[in-house]
A protein has these predicted regions:
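A short, charged/proline- and glycine-enriched loop
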Residues: 143-147, 178, 330-332
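Carboxylate/His-rich catalytic cores and anion/metal-binding grooves
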Residues: 147-157, 162-165
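Glycine-rich oxoanion-binding loops at beta->alpha junctions
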Residues: 118-139, 164-165, 169-203
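A SIS-like phosphosugar-recognition module
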Residues: 192, 197, 203-495, 499
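Extended, charge-enriched "interface" segments that sit outside catalytic cores
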Residues: 4-142, 486
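Short, hydrophobic/aliphatic alpha-helical segments
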Residues: 137-149, 260-262
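Short glycine-enriched loops at secondary-structure junctions
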Residues: 154-158, 188, 245-249
């Protein structure tokens, strides 16, 4: 039987709070550090490795974290989620984004519909539509091919799909799968839509309107903006627009769209990149086969999240360490630092996914909690961040845990050798040096140049950003956030009660 208890009532959490603190500066110095780097590794899907050698953990802390995972029933709660339990009690909804990429457990039937079959059906419909666009079977009114796709949406309808598109754009060009350029309109500020429309040939553009409810203010406002632009160009908007929405929304059967593809209430916006929300734009931009590879990578990582052993479950361990840092060590924020320009918008997507999920102060029963919950998430790609906010990370008064992401190879296979090393080698050397510097510090008699060290970090290391690896990376963070929601608030971590309160 699953029980839902506040974090501070769990005996294992009380024990965790009493475990001795790890001096990461000492632990990462010399032979100790080399040993930790080899031992504190967990394999992930698609060739990734999660390395937590520079985190403030040791055997005692890890044992306490394992006890916390067991008492909090993290494995059982995840199993209940993917088997169709009502996890989102605030809105009385199932939580099924993992089901968009694979079947982890039992068949999930909701509203009389097998939901896995429903999601696959939408993916197949999108693939058929995208292939017809690419082949020229579906064209503009003049019989000419569409060359650009523009997604209109906000929040999870923008941040995730935009981040995924940017992550794969160069890979697709290098691997000859690039079909159409994608643009995104999100902000209700008219300059956003105006600038995008000025940058495209509207006669050869297809627009995707994304709104689950069909009533999202910003999205419908921008749709009107786009329709005016099409009308002013002498074009029939209904021949240039498709919708991604729910089957019950006013958009579902409208004649204003070439086609409508469906999502449902069981997919939270910030977890919708593997649903039709991401599927339509990514399939049009890169082809359905690329989107399928992306789903396969996410599904492979989801399977690892089922493991009850925290040393074989990178998402659960990452989540547990994050809770330890937030609730025992008292760190207020976390920086996500991908050393890949392809992931330039990935931190912004994770910022929404994490903070909108775990930025809550009441538990699933509506009761206030007496402890801190989700941290502030921020980040930028390296090495840009090194010349921006790393000053505070190294020498500021707050200790900020760091999540590095690094890759052995770039996407375009173009590089230059300067002083006996390539740019990619310099990039990798930078991230390695930063991990050591944050952990061990650098002594200097000039106090303005002195780095105390003792700043914890972890790194996810992969070979290259490609569709499958991107899917695995996305699933890692989605499932980490989920496990933390289970721990912090017995959480209604999928609900989104305050997004429109100021409107």
């Amino acid at each position: 039987m699953i029980t839902w208890n506040n974090l501070d009532t769990l005996e294992s959490f009380k024990e965790l709070s009493k475990v001795g603190r790890v001096d990461i500066k000492e632990a990462m110095s010399g032979d100790n550090g080399a040993k930790r780097v080899k031992e504190y590794n967990i394999p992930m899907a698609e060739g990734f490795t999660y390395n937590f050698a520079a985190k403030q953990v040791d055997a005692d802390v890890l044992e306490a974290l394992a006890k916390l995972a067991k008492e909090a029933q993290l494995t059982e709660k995840f199993e209940a989620l993917y088997n169709g339990a009502v996890i989102n009690t605030g809105e009385n909804r199932l939580v099924l984004h993992q089901l968009t990429r694979g079947q982890l457990g039992d068949a999930v039937v909701a509203d009389g519909v097998d939901k896995r079959k429903f999601y696959v059906e939408q993916q197949e419909r999108i693939a058929e539509f995208a292939n017809k666009v690419h082949s020229g079977e579906i064209t503009n009114a003049a019989g000419e091919k569409f060359t650009t796709v523009v997604q209109i949406g906000i929040g999870g309808s923008d941040l995730g799909p935009r981040a995924m598109y940017l992550a794969l754009e160069n890979w697709a060009k290098k691997n000859n799968t690039f079909k159409m350029e994608a643009k995104f309109i999100s902000n209700v500020d008219p300059d956003d839509a105006a600038s995008v429309l000025a940058s495209v040939d509207v006669a050869h553009s297809i627009f995707i309107l994304v709104s689950k409810s069909g009533t999202t203010l910003e999205t419908l406002t921008n749709e009107s903006f786009v329709k005016d632009a099409l009308k002013n160009a002498g074009l029939d908007a209904s021949k240039h627009m498709i919708a991604v929405t729910s089957e019950t929304s006013p958009l579902a059967k409208s004649d204003d769209y070439l086609a409508a593809f469906f999502m449902d209430d069981y997919i939270g916006g910030r977890y919708s990149s593997t649903s039709a929300v991401g599927g339509a734009v990514l399939s049009l931009a890169f082809g359905p086969e690329v989107f399928a590879q992306f789903l396969d990578g996410a599904a492979a990582e989801d399977k690892l999240s089922k493991n009850a052993d925290i040393m074989e479950n990178p998402e659960m361990l990452d989540a547990l360490i994050g809770v330890y840092e937030r609730n025992v060590l008292g760190y207020p924020s976390t920086a996500v630092l991908p050393y890949s320009q392809a992931l330039s918008r990935f931190p912004a997507h994770l910022q929404q996914a994490d903070m909108e999920s775990n930025g809550k102060s009441v538990n699933r029963f509506g009761e206030p909690v007496d402890y801190v919950t989700g941290p502030v998430i921020f980040g930028e790609p390296g090495t840009n961040g090194q010349h921006s906010f790393y000053q505070l990370l190294h020498q500021g008064t707050d200790i900020v845990p760091l999540q590095f992401i690094g890759f052995k190879n770039n996407q375009l296979d173009t590089d230059v050798v300067i002083q006996d090393s390539t740019s990619q080698q310099k990039l990798c050397a930078n991230v390695a040096a930063q991990i050591v510097a944050f952990a061990c510090g650098k002594a200097d008699d000039n106090k303005n140049k002195n780095f105390e060290g003792g700043r914890p970090s972890s790194i996810i290391i992969g070979d290259q950003v490609n569709p499958a690896s991107l899917g695995a990376l996305l699933a890692h963070f989605e499932n980490k956030i989920m496990f933390q929601g289970f721990l912090w608030l017995s959480l209604i971590h999928i609900s989104e009660p305050t997004r429109q309160e100021a409107i």
